[in-house]
Design a protein with these regions (language model features):
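A glycine-rich dinucleotide-binding beta-alpha-beta segment and adjacent secondary-structure elements
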Residues: 2-4, 25-29, 63-66, 231-234, ...
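Short amphipathic alpha-helical segments and helix-helix/interface helices
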Residues: 45-46, 131, 274, 278
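General beta-strand structural signal in soluble alpha/beta enzymes
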Residues: 56-58, 103, 334-335
Length: 335
């Protein structure tokens, strides 16, 4: 019953946080709330840290972390080197000294930095377990585009979900109006094969769709209007699957190393999810779609990447201990 967009005192931290507004159902929760209604990082952790005297340096990238005073284990602290993450001409290199450091650059960002620091011998004692057991939610990003609808972009970004079976969950989600760039990665959904035949099945599907329903066929490759016409279906499963990451040179770019995955592949095609999307499309008169990387290359996408710097009893089976302290170093955590 509250009025959309109305301001309220901080409801989360006993009044210590900033004012918030009630939701106006713009659908922008996942891409960034513009109306002060979401409990985002700048309104909780960072806001409260700054209130206690911490300084936040935005648009800054860490490129080196070296133990001070020749103490290899970091007992005396670390020198941290940073550059601007947005300037192409002026790097604005700066050096900082800290008694302790915390790596919190998400799964991929933290792994990438730790790989680089170990490789350049700044932190050579980082465990060989770095990059092991990187997990996703075994998910598939699919959807249904409805050409005769123009209001699918209004509402809460993630509004409902159902279980197809004991291991498969699907959420109905949305993007706000104008957030159509994702449409460049969307194409008509195909069934079945996960090998090289998928490309030909996809071409056949597009040609058949072009003959039977030219409007849907053209709509499947044009991103404009995607947000207002699409129910995005995020499928996740509770299956035990993971990949491992290495830091190496690729044959097509031998000039520098980068993270690459290896080991058993995570499935890109989830039959239960595809059938659900196709049935939904038939019921609503729309077209089921999936990401072109899944269709052409059998490469899944994920919104949830986790792990890579896992806990263990020692450096032989983990990167950090149960208190997130990095093995081999003092005053260093991964969070």
């Amino acid at each position: 019953g509250e009025a959309p967009g109305k301001s309220y005192a901080d409801p989360y931290f006993g009044g210590e946080g900033p004012e918030r507004n009630s939701c106006i159902a713009c659908g922008g929760c996942m891409v960034g709330c513009r109306y002060n209604a979401k409990n985002s990082l700048d309104k909780n952790y960072l806001y409260l840290a700054e209130k206690q005297g911490a300084q936040v340096f935005s648009e800054t990238r860490v490129i080196d972390v070296v133990p001070l005073n020749g103490k290899a284990d970091g007992e005396d602290g670390y020198e941290v080197t940073t550059v601007s993450s947005t300037s192409l001409l002026f790097r604005n290199k700066r050096r900082w000294r800290a008694k302790a450091v915390v790596f919190a650059g998400s799964s991929l960002g933290t792994q990438d930095l730790l790989f680089k620091l170990r490789d350049k011998k700044s932190l050579p004692n980082i465990s060989a377990q770095l990059g092991r057991r990187v997990r996703t939610n075994a998910e598939s990003l699919i959807g249904v585009r409805l050409p005769n609808v123009d209001n699918m972009d209004s509402g809460i970004a993630i509004g409902s979900g159902i279980y197809l079976d004991e291991k498969t969950h699907i959420e109905a989600t949305r993007y706000p109006r104008g957030s159509d760039a994702m449409g460049l990665l969307v194409t008509a959904m195909i069934r079945g094969k996960t090998d090289w035949r998928r490309v030909f099945i996809w071409l056949y599907t597009l040609l058949r769709l072009l003959v039977r329903n030219p409007r849907q066929a053209i709509g499947s490759i044009i991103p404009f209007g995607l947000a207002k016409q699409t129910i995005i279906l995020l499928c996740m499963q509770t299956l035990d699957g993971h990949i491992d990451m290495l830091y190496k040179r690729r044959w097509y770019w031998p000039f520098s190393k980068r993270m690459v995955s290896f080991g058993p592949k995570i499935p890109a095609h989830i039959p239960e999810a595809s059938e659900f999307a196709l049935k939904t499309a038939r019921r609503l008169g729309g077209m089921a779609g999936s990401l072109i990387t899944e269709v052409l290359f059998n490469i899944p996408a994920t919104a949830h990447c986790m792990g890579g710097a896992g806990m263990g009893r020692s450096a032989d089976d983990g990167v950090v201990d149960v208190q997130s302290r990095v093995f081999g170093y003092k005053n260093m955590l991964v969070c």
